[in-house]
């Protein structure tokens, strides 16, 4: 009696609340994972130019509760990968703040190129001239209609001739390109500045990252350290 303020567990602006806080009877309060889901919604809103991943109007909170979303207004595959992780309906499956900051979406260009070089050093790229047909087919599907299709014709002819060699030319596919990047940075340092890989092939990093994630290459000891940031722990 005489209470002038009512404290509730659930708070927040309509359509900007995490799934677990929509059900006030659940007794679940706000946690870091709650903030992560809302941050994912906001990230999509900003990148997409004003769209909500769970829709709008009366259906928005229902979609949040049911985990129904769309990321159709964002083209960046790396951004979508992070947003999808952040807005997962299961709080336990969302990234931590540290995971979020370490995600490739926030990597500078130098780190992205270095990652491609590291992928080019993996056994699959090393054996690009005798690659498994199934792997090549899967990569071809990923590379279809991408900027790096027929990549050899887009590299400066003098540089391509220099690296190609007479006996072992690079195959004109994604594995061949990754091996080319690796060898360029390993053995032809003086020529590295003559080609801007990320500008020439803007969708290469996203395609390779998503493919490597799907194939669990990123979990290998040679690559997994790239997905941690000691400075934010």
Task: Give residue ranges: language-model regions.
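Activation segment/activation loop of eukaryotic-type protein kinase catalytic domains
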Residues: 1-16
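Conserved end of the kinase activation segment
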Residues: 20-33
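Hydrophobic anchor on a C-lobe helix of Hanks-type protein kinase catalytic domains
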Residues: 46-47
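Short proline-rich PxxP-based motifs
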Residues: 62-74
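Conserved C-terminal C-lobe helix
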Residues: 74-88
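Terminal C-lobe "cap" of eukaryotic-type protein kinase domains
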Residues: 89-113
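Regulatory extensions appended to serine/threonine kinase catalytic cores
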Residues: 112-233
